[in-house]
C-alpha cells in the first residue's frame, strides 16, 4: 500500500490476510465499543440459553472500526458457521436465494455494505428474515411460477457505512442495531500492544502513543501504520518500535502528526494558499489538487471535517483556523472556526453517554 492511501480506512485485497491475523476471535478480546459489546453479549447469551438464533443484527459506522470482526465474533460465540458476502456481489435475487438455501440451522449470514444490495434481492431477503422462506420465480411472463422454499433459521448480520441509504423496511427487520464510534487514543494504544504481541513486534509505550495519535481513531489504520513502522524499525533501526522510530517511519510515508497524508495536506494548502481559506466549490478545489471531486469528497473531507480543519458551508469549502495553524500559516482575523477547539483533541473526548 502506498503512502498516499496508508491512512485510508478501507481494506485492500492484498492486506486482508494479515488483517485477519490480528482480528479478535471472541467478544472478550474486542477492544473498546463497551456499550455495543455489552449489548451484544446480552443478545447472544440470551439466544444461547433459549436455544434459538438471536435477532438479526445491523452494525453501522465508518469503515475500519470492527464491523466485520464483530460479525465473525457473533458466529464464534454462537458456535455456528458464517457465510460472508457483500451487497454489490448480490446482483440478482437468484444469487441470494442460492446463499440462503445453503445455510445450516443457526448459521450466520454476513452481508457487508448491505445498503448496496440490489432491490429485487432486498425484497427476497424480507421474507427470509421474517418467515425463513423465499419464493423463487421460475420462468418468465404469464407462465412464471413462484416456488416457495424453506430456509433454515439463521441470523443475518448486516454492515453499512451509510445507514441513511437503507430502506425503512430493511432497517425495521433488524432486531438489534448498533453504531460503532471512533476509538480513543488510549483504546488504540491497547489495540496496538495486542497486535504487536500477535505479530511478534517489540513496541514501547511511547511508540504506541505516537502511532495511535496518527491513526484517525481507526483500528485498521493503526494496525497498518504499525506494520509500516515495524518495517522501518527492522531495516533502519534496532527492530523496536519506539517513538523515534515511529516518527521517522511516518515521515518517510508522509503521514503527519494528525494523521494527514499528502492529499489531505494538498487540499488544505490549496484552500489556504490559492483561495485564501475559501469558500470555494468542490469541483474547483478538486481541479486545484489534480483529483476527481468524488475523491476529495469521499476520501479527504470526512476526516478533515471531523478534525475541525475544514468546514462545508452553503457557499463552499472553508479552511478553519486550525487548518491555517496546522500548515504553519497565520490565520486572518475573523476566520471561520476561530473559536473551534484544537484539532489534536479529536479522539480524546469520551462519547456522550445516553
UniProtKB/Swiss-Prot annotation:
Region (Disordered): 330-354
Positions that bind Mg(2+): 68
GO cellular component: cytoplasm; Holliday junction resolvase complex
Keywords from the UniProt entry: ATP-binding, Cytoplasm, DNA damage, DNA recombination, DNA repair, DNA-binding, Hydrolase, Nucleotide-binding
Region span, Small ATPAse domain (RuvB-S): 184-254
Main location as per UniProt: cytoplasm
Example GO BP: DNA repair
GO MF annotation terms: ATP binding; ATP hydrolysis activity; four-way junction DNA binding; four-way junction helicase activity
Signal peptide: none
Catalytic activity: ATP + H2O = ADP + phosphate + H(+)
UniProt similarity note: Belongs to the RuvB family.
Matching PANTHER family: HOLLIDAY JUNCTION BRANCH MIGRATION COMPLEX SUBUNIT RUVB, PTHR42848
Function: The RuvA-RuvB-RuvC complex processes Holliday junction (HJ) DNA during genetic recombination and DNA repair, while the RuvA-RuvB complex plays an important role in the rescue of blocked DNA replication forks via replication fork reversal (RFR). RuvA specifically binds to HJ cruciform DNA, conferring on it an open structure. The RuvB hexamer acts as an ATP-dependent pump, pulling dsDNA into and through the RuvAB complex. RuvB forms 2 homohexamers on either side of HJ DNA bound by 1 or 2 RuvA tetramers; 4 subunits per hexamer contact DNA at a time.
Name of this protein: Holliday junction branch migration complex subunit RuvB
Protein encoded by which gene: ruvB
